[in-house]
Amino acid sequence: MDEKRALTLCGGGAKGAYEIGAVRALYELGETFDIITGTSIGALTGAMLVQGDAEQLYRLWEGLSIRSVMTEGFAFDGSLETLFRNKGDIVPFLKSYVNKKGADIEPFRKIIRDYGDEARFFASPIDFALIAVRFPAFTPVEMTKSRMPRGQYKDW
């Protein structure tokens, strides 16, 4: 049985930002992967790597902010100081969250539409899997490249 090398990427903006630096270092060392998996922002990062868009991915991450992925979003590191500093952003975010029954991630969807290349994704020899959350049930959903229906790449 041939051994395969896999890269697993987490969800969460801070983890994703850290992982981009680690991925860049691995690629600069000439490391390659047969399988890439990701959750949330890690799935976007992984899909772009599968497409062969590492350089474009690095440029995308250099310009990302909370509002690049979520309308009415705000940065929160768990500290009270940050909470008070961002208090003007919290009320609009909470109102939007309650009214829409979740965060408005239309900016994140736009990134997927703008950067996703279904043809290159499916043509790549790199296997891919992701975990997403089914809304509004908030149940996990797993999808692999081999099971993903053509024409629905950007929906995942």
Regions found by a protein language model. Give the residues of each.
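Patatin-like phospholipase
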Residues: D2-I112, P140-W156
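A short alpha-helix-loop-beta-strand transition element characteristic
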Residues: R67-F74, G116-A129
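Internal, conserved structured core segments that host functional sites
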Residues: F128-T139
